[in-house]
Amino acid sequence: MTDLLASTLEHLETLVSFDTRNPPRAIAAEGGIFDYLRAQLPGFQVEVIDHGDGAVSLYAVRGTPKYLFNVHLDTVPDSPHWSADPHVMRRTEDRVIGLGVCDIKGAAAALVAAANAGDGDAAFLFSSDEEANDPRCIAAFLARGLPYDAVLVAEPTMSEAVLAHRGISSVLMRFAGRAGHASGKQDPAASALHQAMRWGGKALDHVESLAHARFGGLTGLRFNIGRVDGGIKANMIAPAAELRFGFRPLPSMDVDGLLATFAGFADPAAAHFEETFRGPSLPSGDIARAEERRLAARDVADALDLPIGNAVDFWTEASLFSAGGYTALVYGPGDIAQAHTADEFVTLAQLQRYVESVNRIINGSH
């Protein structure tokens, strides 16, 4: 085991021990994980800001770096299926297991290890609100307009540079009907649940019509009706129904246009339609601008000797940096298939590969 990997594992064990589950959005700026990170970054100018509701950012700079590394420190809640305490990291022959080791405290530990392996220029932005779908930390950073050639956002990409991914939009719909006995002939709009079912059929047909759309190796529109609530009992016409759905567009797709199309499948007089969250695609912008930004990110990956991976379906905050005008890519250790799972793990080989690469970027010739 190399010294870099040993140092990474030491820091990772400590980072895992801090409870940063989100929700409940209870991560504090003082004490805990942020005090630990501050203490591990001697020689850095460190700024910790509490943005409220568990959103805390730590911005650390040494020298005049060209690149910013961004890592979120919050994790999803643990499930009942963990076989041991999720906040006690376990080591096996080829991996470590613990809540957040893959998504994505392993990257944070590696960056701290690399920072302490030399005195090269470096900039880190650690945040605690990525899992909350309320990106206050990134929004506050973008408002400052600090100059960087590129931002490398850590998420599990098998230590390959990801240049493109889907956006995400979440929508709440409410349908209004008229209560009554189910034995009689119904007006088609009487049942709120029937309205929701008809809307779902039209929406699914539209999604199928987009199956052949492509961008950067991605195909089609990802769409999911995640929840439908409503009605009282089988012999009563449902007076109200609520439906929640989400979709993940290609970078080349017009999100506002898609929302208008989905909204148009319902009677506006009987349905409420509200987008509750939107994350842009990576790269952001129209087709021409997105392709220009993708090529710029590819040039950065090539300059840093990072292997380039395929575009991915999952969303990351790299898209927020892209929308804010930065060249951005996603790069981190581990497999996304392990994120959010019981007994989450990352392999030692992945941590080794990542820490060596960021050490080279920080302390090498880049």
UniProtKB/Swiss-Prot annotation:
Pathway: Amino-acid biosynthesis; L-arginine biosynthesis. Binds 1 Co(2+) ion per subunit. Coiled coil: none annotated. InterPro entries: ACDase_ArgE'-like (IPR043697), Bact_exopeptidase_dim_dom (IPR036264), Peptidase_M20 (IPR002933), Peptidase_M20_dimer (IPR011650), Peptidase_M20A (IPR050072). It comes from the Bacteria. The active site is at 130 (proton donor/acceptor). Its EC number is 3.5.1.-. GO terms for molecular function: acetylornithine deacetylase activity; cobalt ion binding; N-acetylcitrulline deacetylase activity. It catalyses: N(2)-acetyl-L-citrulline + H2O = L-citrulline + acetate; N(2)-acetyl-L-ornithine + H2O = L-ornithine + acetate. One of its GO terms (biological process) is L-arginine biosynthetic process. NCBIfam families: PRK08737.1. Forms homodimers in the crystal, but higher order oligomers may form in solution. Belongs to the peptidase M20A family. N-acetylcitrulline deacetylase subfamily. Consists of two domains, a catalytic domain (formed by residues 1-166 and 286-365 from the N and C termini, respectively) and a dimerization domain (residues 167-285). Catalyzes the deacetylation of N-acetyl-L-citrulline to produce L-citrulline. This is a step in an alternative arginine biosynthesis pathway. Is also able to catalyze the deacetylation of N-acetylornithine in vitro, with almost equal velocity. However, this reaction may be not relevant in vivo since Xanthomonas does not possess the canonical argF gene and cannot convert ornithine to citrulline via ArgF'. HAMAP family: ACDase. This is N-acetyl-L-citrulline deacetylase. It comes from Xanthomonas campestris pv. campestris (strain ATCC 33913 / DSM 3586 / NCPPB 528 / LMG 568 / P 25). The gene is argE'.
